[in-house]
Amino acid sequence: PVGNGSPGANGDNGSSPVDGQVVRVTGIVTAILKKGFYIQTPDDQADKDPKTSEGIYVFGENSVGMVSAGDLVQVDGTVTEFRPRTERIFLSITEITKPTVKVISKSNPLPAPIALTSTDLDPKGKLDQMERFEGMRVTGDFVAVGPTGGVTNEKTGFSGSNGVFFAVLQGTPRPVREPGLGI
């Protein structure tokens, strides 16, 4: 997002260099969830630094009802590194909390998704190698390889996803584990 928080709001590694600071960012709403929404820098304003993300999550239930996908918004709030669950192995998610949101314009085109390739996903890469895509629209030729954290009701036949799933790019050799002993 453009502003005094970008590219610094997300930074170029696993945590934000402005964690705990109040920032002002501007971006296009790309997705709306129950407790917040994602914004991303318009394509023509992206910083072109391949190590930094152009997107960020805005956490705040009260602001969800006032935005729509495609809105250009200005957000003032505190940058926070949120770690889902209590397990230390999960990476933190950079988000803006306690937001004040102002809609600048509506019906803007969404930023183009970044096409992920096998060069973006190095099995021997750093744990935070995907940080540069955090909060951004991405696409790829993916194959799901693991279950979601959603819900399944066998009695009614309903299943729902929480949006979290495990996937690999099509053509990835042995996508579930690293090469080892032949079985």
Residue ranges and their predicted role:
Residues P1-I183:
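Extended non-catalytic accessory segments flanking core domains
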